Amino acid sequence: MIRFRPAAARELADDVAYYDRDYEGRGHRFSDAVDRTLGLIATLPEAYPLLYEPEIRSAKVARFPYRVVYVIVGGDIDVLAVAHARRRPGYWRRRR
């Protein structure tokens, strides 16, 4: 099961809205790319590199400068952030 922390869900919604507003049609493509990344994470959650202890991992979103940051908790995936790769690195660490 994949669960989004509330702040991560808000980030994703805000980023989709940004792409829809500023780049017509891109919000849908961004959302699809995040969904594909989540599918890959669900299939092989431990395949992605550790960023920080304990067990914080990150998977790149194809074609967009974003990463899905997550932890594995009891076999489930908790998404901590859908983070822009070049803005405010590590801002989501306090969400653990």
Regions found by a protein language model. Give the residues of each.
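Short alpha-helical segments used as structural interaction elements across diverse proteins
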Residues: 2, 23, 54-57, 64, ...
